[in-house]
């Protein structure tokens, strides 16, 4: 089995992170790689409905972990005290992934591709002064004047996805077994 690679897609709110994760995932799947994703949420997830069986298992029954098995999909709800890092999450839940695309987790030590739109703020998250600046491997932006010591792609272009997928694959963190 191939080693698992991980790369993080970071950016400010509404900068296009999810759109890029989806596009990269689709391109890598097209290449026949087994792709899985991790999404970092900033607020409590509320996917269950009050009074439904799984909600009752979790809230009334106080179950630590609930697995919902349905036709074509599986959902796991798990109580946790502390936030896990993306590498631990991948090791625990994403066995068999060849590439894990991580949306968010900016402060974790993973190679990063940033989405930066000027409407989201005057500056990207990356700056040369950041102590972790070397973790950035590429940027996609609408700022035609932006320059960096790594590849910079423009949202307005249409031919960069294949190249960016190559960069993601080549520069991703390879998890040791």
Per-range role (PLM):
Residues 1-4:
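Phosphate-binding P-loop
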Residues 77-108:
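Phosphate-binding/switch loop-helix module in NTP-utilizing enzymes
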Residues 9:
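Hydrophobic anchor at the beta1->P-loop junction of P-loop NTPases
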Residues 13:
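The conserved Walker
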Residues 17:
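Conserved lysine of the Walker
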Residues 99-174:
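Phosphate/Mg2+-binding loops and adjacent switch elements
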Residues 23-81:
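N-terminal phosphate/diphosphate-binding loop that engages ATP/GTP or pyrophosphate donors
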């Amino acid at each position: 089995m191939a080693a698992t690679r991980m790369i993080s897609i970071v950016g400010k709110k509404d900068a296009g992170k999810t759109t890029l994760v989806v596009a990269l995932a689709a391109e890598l799947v097209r290449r026949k790689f087994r792709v899985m994703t991790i999404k970092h949420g900033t607020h409590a997830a509320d996917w269950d409905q009050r009074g439904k069986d799984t909600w009752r298992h979790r809230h009334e029954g106080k179950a630590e972990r609930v697995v919902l098995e349905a036709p074509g999909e599986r959902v796991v709800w798990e109580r946790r005290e502390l936030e896990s890092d993306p590498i631990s999450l991948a090791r625990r839940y994403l066995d068999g992934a060849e590439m894990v695309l991580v949306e968010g987790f900016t402060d974790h030590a993973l190679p990063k591709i940033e989405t930066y739109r000027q409407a989201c703020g005057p500056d990207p998250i990356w700056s040369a002064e950041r102590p972790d600046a070397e973790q950035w491997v590429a940027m996609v932006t609408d700022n035609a004047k932006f320059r960096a010591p790594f590849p910079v792609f423009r949202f307005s272009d249409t031919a960069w996805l294949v190249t960016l997928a190559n960069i993601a694959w080549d520069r991703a963190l390879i998890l040791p077994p």
